[in-house]
Amino acid sequence: MKQKLIKKNMFLFFLMAPLLLLAQDVVKGKVTDSSLGDPLPGVNVVIKGTTTGTTTDFDGNYELSVDNFPSILVFSSLGYASKEMQVSGPSTLNVALDESATGLEEVVVTGLATSVKRSNAANAVASVSADELTGRTPPQTLDGALAGKFAGAQITAASGAPGGGMSVKLRGVTSINGQGQPLYIIDGVYVNNNSVYAGGLNEISNAAGGGASSTDSQDNASNRIADINPDDIQNIEILKGASASAIYGSRAAAGVIIITTKKGKAGKTKINVSQALGWNEAVNLLGQRNWTAALAESVYGEGALYTAAESAGRLRDYEKVIYGEKGFITNTNLSISGGGEKTSFFGSFTNNEEDGIVKRTGASKQSLRLNVDHRITDDIKLSLTGNYLKSSADRGFFNNDNSNTTIGVSLLFTRPWDYLLPDADGNYPDHPANSSNQIHTRDVMTNNESVSRLIAGGALDVNLFRNENQSLKMILKAGVDTYTLKTTVFFPRELQFMSPAVGGVDGLSSDGTTQNADANFSGFLVHNFRTDNELSFTTQAGVTNEQFSQNTVRVTSTGLIASEQNVDQAANVKVDQFRLEQEDAGFFVQEEVNYQDKIVGTLGIRGDKSSNNGDANKLFYYPKASLAANIHNFDFWNIEAMNQLKLRAAYGEAGNFAPNGALFTTYINSLISGNVGIITPATLGDPSIQPERQKEFEIGLDAGFFNNKVTLEFTWYNKKVEDLILQADNEPSSGYTFRWANAGALENKGAEIGLNVNAFDSENFSWDSGIIWFRNRSEITELTVASFDTQGFGTGLGTFRIEEGKSATQIVGNDENGNVVALGDAEPDFQMSFNNNFKYKDFTLSFFWHWKKGGDNVNLSRLLSDFGNTSADYDKMNLDPSGTLNNGDYRKSAFGGGFADPFVEDASYLKLREIGLYYNLPENALQKLFNGNVSNVKVGLSGHNIINIFDYNSYDPEVSNFGSTAAGIGIEVAPFPSSKRFMFHLSIGL
């Protein structure tokens, strides 16, 4: 009996032993957000020194088998500081992660298929959080909201009108004629940021020769990234160097801006409603000349008219009449998010409306978004994102004008005694001193741009294999960005400058439509392997394919019948069309080696081919390499005050394909003796042109002091661009004036510094501050063609010139002796920003200053006001060295003599870019007022550009007539002035 009992117990022991052992080596728990207490799904939980790990489910729960104790578990998630926790045995371990927008332990996206801790990244990666982007005040556009918030970017507006275009340059000029703006990627979708000029305003203003090109940079178009709703964004990461952006292909030659939108979290469904109301007003006005009857008589012989207008109370400041409006602003946002065990979602609807500071101008935008994440199994995850956008913008009639017809130019020729208002019957008088009555133009013309857009994408993550030392993952991504852009331009025949008697076209109506479709597909394999001595290898390989097409059709009619707006009701009808189809494909391979987080090295190569090459199947190869050394992780490190020190170096190459049309010769249709035919263009294409090749080397250090209370980042870079694609003179006997050729090289050198200080952090009060400083210097290091001008209006006024040994953004002009000399440079001496955040109990105060030191503009607005004899400083005597001429006559004399120096001005500024003051209702008040049904209530007020300090003699040194060009920003011709904004806010969370 006793033996039977022993045998029975032994049988039960061996039966239960595996279960007992299984129960003994499990560590489980929950991961939450430290500030909100919400569960965090998708957090990586890995046993340090191995590849063994798991991810939290949609409730933030995890369960991990651990073979050996004690062990260290590493918890990491995008947007949060990583945390390491030691476990000495089977247990329940709950962990709270802190959000980290600037910490060195933040996880950042640096590859097509992988992410890395910031402390291990060998490249300078800038990050902008949702709070930094929209937390102070709602921005007009996404790209405009980035100004001054990270090092290395020069951002310039093409118009101050709501919805106007912007230019973003990272680390200087990347190309003269090719792509000069960064690639934008939203949740894995390559989005289109082209400026499409389909309006036809040049037909009226005769700017750029009155051309009707869909690529004419003077037609005041907006960048399409302006469509994106900033309130949907969770985080933005900026890859500025070729070593980081190389694997994204040739579209990323000018850098990459990676945008991650908000996601849902498991748990209670959350609803948030926010409303912002406010107004805008002009940043600065030029003012008017100090007119008197005697002065009016002296200049125009119209002293009696001045006196009569003065007696009748009809002296008007027409600048305030045009730019004196206070535009109403409303931003409404509704979001809902939540999820269950396997599925989470985020949805939002936004409606933004903003009137301009000029009557009948403004912009509106509606956005509808849905993001869904679903874990099909423990090893398969599907992510879907969709965003429908609809926008409309009315931007008036401004910028460059060769016929004195735009509102801005006409205003500069207007005297206070001129009577321009309509009579009782609605009839407008002609302008007595100009070819256009700007009040009439403002009240009846149309310049509308509307967009309907869909951005959608999906990603499938599949864990193919995993054991203690290695894993293999497959990632598939696809995205589409398609939009229809419609432009409507209408100038009725009743306008003064439309009369054929003065050379007008008897009314103009223009309808343009652009159909644009971009698609991207990619597939990756990622293999992780870790040896027993904590040496890890991450291998990734993949293929990509991008397809894009554009079809722009514009119908322009003149000689309208009774000002009929339909384009077929006219004496003359002209049709223009521009079509583009392109396909790019590539592959990449990258190997990352990590030794105990002490030394991290990366090698990679990208191969690219494009239908825009002379040989569409030819691959161009672009290597990259980087090395980061975390000195603080070595055993010899014993400086307690300096808890982190990383030294890094990186090198990379990137390509930039030829601009459209450079590889072939485009013939032009024409009537020849009454018959339809074709003629040769002025420029000869060349299918043998090579892509521009960018080679960039950067070094830097990242440091943390006093447990990262103080962090410092420093980067120095050298970016060389070879095989610049330029237009060269051609032999006249060939029949072509110019030819495309690889004919030069340029170089950018610069430095970037970032310093963040958490000065105080107590229960009731906290203060953190940040400073960013950066500068860039460019030089044309080789030029095998003759020096040439890029943008501007000739050396008599100041123009941008490409010249060997000189800056790529130099401004040249004639001196007093007629010699062409350097007069300035659009590149700033440096830029600097100051960011401060204060929190006292339930109040928060945040403000952000932006300082641009140096950099010059060609200011032609002041010259035009001189021609109109209306400049505010016309009668002052502080410009002429001889003391003989007043300022206005001196500038006109300089123009008459071809002397450009008075028109090139320092464009420095100091701006209070953003400020916000908010109050969060405390929890006890919420409980008392709403019985726990409301989770948060926030009220506040904010401002944008409310303090602007500059000596520049015009509306705003930030606004440029050629704002979207790669080289040549900083030319101003009577633009739509920029505005300051004041807002009130209410936000309620359920």
Language-model features: locations:
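Outer-membrane beta-barrel transmembrane strands
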Residues: 325-341, 349-352, 438-489, 510-532, ...
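Outer-membrane beta-barrel transmembrane domain signature of Gram-negative proteins
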Residues: 308-337, 492, 502-600, 651, ...
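Flexible loop and strand-edge segments within Gram-negative outer membrane beta-barrel domains
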Residues: 282, 311-319, 327-361, 367-436, ...
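Surface-exposed loop/turn segments flanking beta-strands in extracellular/periplasmic regions
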Residues: 291-314, 403-440, 491-509, 549-577, ...
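Short, small/polar-rich motifs associated with maturation and membrane association
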Residues: 1-12, 17-369, 374, 381-389, ...
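Membrane-interface anchoring segments and C-terminal beta-barrel signals
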Residues: 642, 884-990
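Surface-exposed, extracytoplasmic segments of Gram-negative outer-membrane nutrient-acquisition systems
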Residues: 301, 305, 309, 675-681, ...
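Small-side-chain secondary-structure face that scaffolds active or pore-lining regions
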Residues: 357-367, 373, 387-389, 395-400, ...
